[in-house]
């Protein structure tokens, strides 16, 4: 994609020459646009092609690829400009205006032609042979905060790729991304720093050598356990789930039955058991001792083929428990597990404390009639929303576009019954993200219909319909969402959290850290 923007930053008064000089220093610092851009992709980030001062306006022509897109770039300029000139020249920024914005997507001519007559709210769509131009005009801060640009791009992409879409878009009766409920915090949220940036200097976490992993020290662990206790009391116990201890080392055959290997095979950690040949491992040890490095190639020869994965969904053992069993939907099952880590391989997507490869959550899984399964799903979501409101945490709930059991899958030929909405996702607002209104997903409430029932040969003894559902309360993300809105000052926290946490423990005493 390419982005071309004509816009203005509108100041509170005419920009005088001395002020202009300071602003130009900011404009010429391209590092502003390179934060978060992968190495080698710098040309994809926002670039200021021209600028001009005109009274109160700073007129900008900007272009970009897919990293720090132009509409994000113009917003990103506000903070460093104000830091440079606000107090020094007694000037403020009144608004950001985008006069014209062209987003260009490319596709095969045959696919482009299928979009003829497509209407997209708040923009125009212009088609060329291999190009789709999405044209916006007269956008202000309000439209940017409503995220209409990203929604329009997503809408066009969905239309463009309909024949290649994940099964989710075929199944779901409400458009994924639709917000079904939200809550605005009653207090003024003044904390606006990325909690990851403070967690390390404060000594609450320390980076672990593995990608997407952290060592959580005593204060963070205390907060984790407080949230775990509150979620169990305020959500899980109120619905009557029974705690079980689920295995976390999952045989590949289980993942095959779940169809997980079809949808997201690249998102798991695969486990290779070692061969039980001590003399061969002695060679490995000897070589390591002599070379003072790990002989990876030799180690590969000592491992069997992949046989397991580390649990990527946490609910896998539930379906295995009922594999080819006869059940009675008059006596439905409701289990929950909080016994250990869940593992997802995010690759380059792992960042900060909110998107990690190793995380904690309370996983609820249930089975019964379709009506029972839908009611339990609704209850798990309802109590999560009530908890957020009790803690005055700003959130919204939307229709999910990636239910884990459908993610990446294109078709289903087994005659599976699916719910009208496979997934709802509840997000806590992240105030430190300025370019768009972004939230961290803290609760994922899913209904699977007969997907797993068919895959594991589960039947009701009277041949009645059996459905399953699962809700994950992401403990790691609840904590990060909470810290993003409240910060690290204990005195600013809600009374419920303070009582659960008690006295915060001290960080480890280390001379060279944090």
From Swiss-Prot:
NCBIfam families per record: PRK00960.1 (NF002120), serS_MJ (TIGR00415)
Domain of life from the UniProt record: Archaea
Compartment annotation: Cytoplasm
Gene Ontology terms for molecular function: ATP binding; serine-tRNA ligase activity; zinc ion binding
GO biological process terms on file: selenocysteine biosynthetic process; seryl-tRNA aminoacylation
Chief location bin: cytoplasm
Enzyme's top EC category: ligase
UniProt pathway: Aminoacyl-tRNA biosynthesis; selenocysteinyl-tRNA(Sec) biosynthesis; L-seryl-tRNA(Sec) from L-serine and tRNA(Sec): step 1/1
Self-association state and partner proteins as the record states: Homodimer.
Catalytic activity annotation: tRNA(Ser) + L-serine + ATP = L-seryl-tRNA(Ser) + AMP + diphosphate + H(+); tRNA(Sec) + L-serine + ATP = L-seryl-tRNA(Sec) + AMP + diphosphate + H(+)
Protein name: Type-2 serine--tRNA ligase
Domain comment as written in the entry: Consists of two distinct domains, a catalytic core and a N-terminal extension that is presumably involved in tRNA binding.
Cofactor names: Zn(2+)
Binding site for L-serine: 313, 344, 361-363
Chain positions recorded as Zn(2+) binding sites: 315, 363, 470
Coiled-coil residue spans: none
A Pfam family: tRNA-synt_2b
EC number: 6.1.1.11
């Amino acid at each position: 994609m390419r982005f071309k923007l004509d816009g203005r930053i509108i100041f509170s008064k005419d920009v005088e020459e001395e002020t202009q000089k300071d602003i130009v220093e900011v404009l010429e610092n391209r590092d502003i646009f390179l934060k978060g851009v992968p190495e080698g992709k710098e040309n994809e980030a926002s670039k200021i092609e021209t600028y001009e001062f005109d009274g109160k306006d700073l007129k900008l022509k900007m272009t970009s690829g897919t990293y720090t897109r132009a509409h994000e770039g113009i917003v990103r300029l506000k903070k460093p400009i104000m830091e440079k000139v606000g107090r020094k020249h007694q000037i403020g920024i009144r608004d950001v205006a985008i006069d014209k914005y062209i987003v260009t997507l490319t596709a095969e001519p045959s696919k482009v032609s299928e979009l003829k007559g497509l209407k997209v709210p708040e923009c125009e769509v212009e088609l060329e042979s291999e190009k789709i131009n999405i044209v916006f005009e007269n956008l202000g801060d309000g439209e940017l905060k409503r995220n209409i640009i990203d929604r329009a791009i997503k809408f066009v992409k969905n239309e463009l790729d309909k024949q290649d879409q994940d099964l989710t878009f075929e199944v779901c009766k409400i458009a994924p991304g639709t917000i079904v409920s939200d809550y605005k915090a009653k207090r003024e949220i003044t904390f606006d720093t990325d909690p990851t940036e403070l967690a390390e200097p404060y000594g609450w976490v320390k980076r672990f050598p593995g990608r997407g992993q952290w060592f959580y020290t005593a204060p963070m662990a205390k907060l984790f356990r407080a949230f775990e206790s509150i979620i169990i009391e305020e959500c899980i116990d109120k619905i009557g789930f029974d705690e079980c201890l689920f295995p976390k080392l999952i045989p590949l055959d289980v993942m095959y039955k779940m169809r997980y290997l079809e949808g997201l095979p690249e998102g798991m950690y695969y486990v290779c058991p070692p061969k039980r040949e001590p003399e061969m491992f002695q060679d490995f040890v000897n070589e390591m001792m002599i070379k003072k490095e790990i002989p990876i190639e030799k180690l590969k020869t000592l491992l069997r083929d992949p046989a397991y994965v580390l649990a990527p969904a946490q609910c896998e053992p539930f379906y295995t428990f009922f594999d080819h069993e006869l059940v009675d939907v008059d006596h439905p099952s409701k289990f929950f597990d909080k016994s250990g880590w869940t593992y997802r391989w995010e690759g380059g997507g792992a960042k900060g404390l909110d998107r990690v490869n190793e995380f904690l959550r309370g996983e609820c899984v249930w089975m019964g009639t379709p009506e029972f399964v839908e009611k339990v799903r609704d209850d798990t979501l309802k109590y999560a929303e009530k908890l957020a409101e009790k803690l005055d945490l700003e959130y919204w709930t939307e229709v999910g576009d990636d239910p884990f059991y459908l993610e990446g899958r294109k078709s289903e030929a087994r005659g599976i019954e699916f719910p009208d909405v496979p997934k709802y996702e509840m997000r806590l607002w992240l105030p430190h993200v300025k370019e768009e209104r972004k939230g961290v997903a803290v609760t994922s409430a899913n209904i699977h219909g007969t997907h797993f029932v068919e895959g594991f040969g589960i039947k009701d003894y009277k041949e009645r319909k059996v459905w399953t559902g699962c809700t994950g309360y992401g403990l790691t993300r609840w904590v990060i969402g909470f810290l993003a809105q409240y910060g690290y000052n204990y005195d600013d926290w809600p009374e419920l959290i303070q009582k659960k946490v008690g006295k915060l423990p001290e960080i480890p005493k280390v001379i060279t850290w944090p």
